[in-house]
C-alpha cells in the first residue's frame, strides 16, 4: 500500500510539472500513525530510481512528510525486527540503515536512534525525517518531545 501511494504521489506530481526536486511544492504526506512510516524509505527509493542521489532524496522526502502521533503509549509505537524487514522489504533496509547512520552522526542520544536492539523504530524515523511533528493535542506534543525525542 505504501509503495502504491508513493508511486501515485510521484506520478501525479510529475503530471503537474514537478521535476521531483521540488516535490514539496506538489505534495505533502501526513503520517498519522507509525504503520505508514515506510513511506519515507519508499519515497527515497523511488526518487533514487528516478536518478536523484540519496542525500538529495532524503532532503526532498524530509520536506514532504509530516508526522502526527496519536498516543503517548510506547507500546503503540511500532517497532519491527530487522530480520523481518530484511525478508519483507529487503530493498528498503539499506535506506533505513543509511537514515539511522545519519541520525547517529548528528545525535548522541541512543534512545532516539532508528535502529536499536535489533528493531526499527518507526516513530523515530518519522520524527527525524519529517518536516513537522505533532501530537493530536498540545499535551501529546509536549510529552512526545520530552519522552521520545528529548527536546
Where in the sequence are the language-model features?
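Short, glycine-/Ser/Thr-/acidic-enriched flexible segments
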Residues: 1, 34-36, 71, 103, ...
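Function-dense linear segments that define catalytic or interfacial modules
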Residues: 1-31, 38
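Short, hydrophobic/aromatic alpha-helical segments in well-folded domains
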Residues: 5, 42-46, 60, 129
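Core structural elements
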Residues: 30-42, 64-68
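Generic beta-strand/beta-sheet core signal
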Residues: 30-32, 60, 128, 133-136
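Extended, well-ordered alpha-helical scaffold/bundle regions in very large, multi-domain proteins
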Residues: 46-97, 101
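Polar, glycine-rich mid-to-C-terminal structural blocks
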Residues: 84-87, 91-134
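Conserved small/polar residues in nucleotide/adenosyl-binding loops
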Residues: 149-151
Amino acid at each position: 500500500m505504501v509503495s502504491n501511494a508513493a508511486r501515485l504521489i510521484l506520478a501525479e506530481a510529475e503530471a503537474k510539472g514537478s521535476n521531483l526536486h521540488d516535490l514539496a511544492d506538489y505534495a505533502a504526506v501526513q503520517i498519522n500513525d507509525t504503520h505508514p512510516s515506510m513511506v519515507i524509505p519508499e519515497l527515497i527509493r523511488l526518487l533514487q530510481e528516478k536518478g536523484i542521489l540519496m542525500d538529495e532524496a532524503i532532503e526532498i522526502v524530509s520536506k514532504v512528510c509530516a508526522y502526527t502521533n496519536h498516543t503517548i503509549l510506547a507500546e503503540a509505537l511500532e517497532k519491527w525486527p530487522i530480520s523481518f524487514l530484511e525478508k519483507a522489504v529487503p530493498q528498503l533496509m539499506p535506506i533505513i540503515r543509511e537514515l539511522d547512520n545519519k541520525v547517529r552522526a548528528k545525535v548522541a542520544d541512543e534512545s532516539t536512534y532508528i535502529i536499536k536492539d535489533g528493531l526499527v523504530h518507526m516513530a523515530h524515523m518519522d520524527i527525524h525525517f519529517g518536516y513537522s511533528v505533532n501530537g493530536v493535542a498540545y499535551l501529546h506534543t509536549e510529552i512526545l518531545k520530552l519522552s521520545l525525542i528529548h527536546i
